Amino acid sequence: RLAAGRAQDIEFLLDRLTGPRPAWRHADLVDRIRIGMAGHSIGGNAAAATMATDPRVLAGINMDGTFVTPVPADGLDGRPFLLLGMPGHSPGGSDDTWDRDWRRLDGWKRWLTVTGTAHIDFSDISVLADQAGLPDPDSPLSGERTAQIMRAYVTAFFDLHLRATPQPLL
């Protein structure tokens, strides 16, 4: 229900940014034909939930989020989706929603596991903690290294699927 509610919020936002009378004075900066969505945790599930109901979102990424709202059994109309997660989200891992929804994704898809990460590493918190002098002593990766990995894969995914720029990383 939470991811579905966030999907409705995103659809409202897209309506307000791309409609005939945009609510933001810089809405002309939004490329209305190349919209992608990425999210962490429930936001990653919201990316898939939004794609299930809104064809304007052409590509999506779930960064370490449980699929509380399942991907529809008939998929996402062939649109690309990237799963980027910690080792607990490996195939056959502790979150079986990834295994279930992987089978439902019907377009280009990748499932990437980032070794040495925890759920929180897919957000800004590990970078901010490092900058504050409070790094996680149990994490083998620095916040900056984790951020570099996330930036590289997220950028490559959207460049490939929204800009049609080949990406050897993927």
Question: PLM features: what roles do these ranges have?
Answer:
Residues 1-29:
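Alpha/beta-hydrolase active-site loop
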Residues 30-32, 57-58:
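Core-facing hydrophobic residues within beta-strands of well-ordered domains
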Residues 5, 9-12, 46, 149, ...:
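Extracytoplasmic/secreted proteins, especially bacterial periplasmic and envelope-associated proteins
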Residues 38-43, 47:
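Gly/Ala-rich beta-loop-alpha elbow adjacent to hydrolase catalytic centers
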Residues 116-119, 125-170:
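Alpha/beta-hydrolase-fold serine-hydrolase catalytic core, especially in secreted/extracellular enzymes
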Residues 10, 35, 111, 158:
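Divalent metal-coordination and catalytic microenvironments
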Residues 49-58:
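Conserved hydrolase catalytic core segment
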Residues 58-121:
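The feature captures the conserved acid-bearing segment of alpha/beta-hydrolase catalytic domains
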